Curated annotation (Swiss-Prot):
Principal location listed in the UniProt entry: cytoplasm
PANTHER family documented for this protein: 40S RIBOSOMAL PROTEIN SA
HAMAP family: Ribosomal_S2_euk (MF_03015)
InterPro entries in UniProt: Ribosomal_uS2 (IPR001865), Ribosomal_uS2_C (IPR032281), Ribosomal_uS2_CS (IPR018130), Ribosomal_uS2_euk (IPR027498), Ribosomal_uS2_euk/arc (IPR005707), Ribosomal_uS2_flav_dom_sf (IPR023591)
Organism: Aedes aegypti (Yellowfever mosquito)
Similarity section: Belongs to the universal ribosomal protein uS2 family.
Residue stretches spanning the membrane: none
Protein name: Small ribosomal subunit protein uS2
Top-rank lineage group of the source organism: Eukaryota
Function: Required for the assembly and/or stability of the 40S ribosomal subunit. Required for the processing of the 20S rRNA-precursor to mature 18S rRNA in a late step of the maturation of 40S ribosomal subunits.
Gene Ontology terms describing biological process: ribosomal small subunit assembly; translation
Pfam entry (one): Ribosomal_S2
Keyword entries, A-Z: Cytoplasm, Ribonucleoprotein, Ribosomal protein
Length: 288
């Protein structure tokens, strides 16, 4: 599928992510239409998915999505809780229309109901749990892209992306890879490293999120641990002293410029005269 182009080839970094998210781990049973995507079978009976075929089908699906003129006509659906967060994130970055949760029956076939929609392309997390939208899409000739495990039925599925669609991390990673390739084909991002992390597409347990929120609320605030002390503002007017600062600063310079003038400040003659006058006055006061 990459056409021997290095820019479209499967990178080692992506393979590492897939292995860490157990994308290659299938189930113990195999659908006869999924046998071509199985690499081997482990001794414990679990089938291993060929990641090379996974990447080829992922690029094919990304090309189909990027070819849609209006991104809002692409519908991403996941009734499984593990894929709802990934679907919402995928729709946010690719401008698709998400359906996270229960699918309203007749949304593609019943024109009377308010929830009626006419998408041009449908993407589902699991064709087994999302069988209702897949079946309705077959009635109105809507092509379907599905993330399929080794035991997933491929009835009414046009493009099957083989992967582990039962692991929360695998589901989030596959939606992240699909969103990245779509944005690359549209020219919105380069083929360098994408700034968005796959962690944003992973499922988060609501109970754990509530516990984290409760822990943040229960933790004392910083202002409670360190109460603020009243700030005393000194309103003394220092304008007079500031005006005298230049004269004080200039005094040492004047002293250094004229060191010979210092001895003149002390006049020994004046002292002698004072002492003489004082002695004379004492003598006159004695009456001798």
């Amino acid at each position: 599928m990459s056409g021997n182009l290095d820019i479209l080839a499967l990178k080692d970094d992506d393979v590492t992510k897939m292995l860490a998210a157990t994308t290659h781990v299938g189930s113990t049973s195999v659908n006869f239409q999924m046998e071509s995507y199985v690499y081997k079978r482990r001794p414990d009976g679990v089938h291993i998915i060929n990641l090379g075929r996974t990447w080829e089908k992922l690029l094919l699906a990304a090309r189909c999505i990027a070819s849609i003129e209006y991104p809002g006509e692409v519908f991403a659906i996941s009734s499984r809780p593990y894929g709802q967060r990934a679907v919402l994130k995928f729709a946010h970055y690719t401008e698709a229309t998400p359906t996270a949760g229960r699918f309203t029956p007749g949304a593609f076939t019943n024109q009377i109901q308010p929830a009626f929609r006419e998408p041009r392309l449908l993407i589902v997390t699991d064709p087994l749990t999302d069988h209702q939208p897949v079946t309705e899409a077959s009635y109105v000739n809507i092509p379907v892209i599905a993330f399929c495990n080794t035991d997933s039925p491929l009835k009414f599925v046009d493009i099957a992306i083989p992967c582990n669609n039962k692991s929360p991390h695998s589901i989030g990673l596959m939606w992240w890879l699909l969103a990245r390739e779509v944005l690359r084909l549209r020219g919105k991002i380069t083929h360098d490293k994408w700034d968005i992390k796959p962690d944003l597409f992973f499922y988060r347990d609501p109970e754990e999120a509530e516990k984290e929120q409760a822990a943040l609320e229960a933790a004392p605030a910083a202002k409670d641990l360190y109460p603020e002390e009243p700030i005393v503002v000194d309103e003394t007017n220092w304008a007079g002293e500031d005006a005298a600062l230049p004269a004080v600063a200039a005094a040492p310079a004047a002293v250094a410029a004229a060191p010979a003038a210092l001895p003149q400040l002390v006049q020994a003659d004046d002292w002698n005269e004072d002492e003489t006058q004082t002695a004379g006055s004492w003598g006159g006061g004695g009456g001798f």
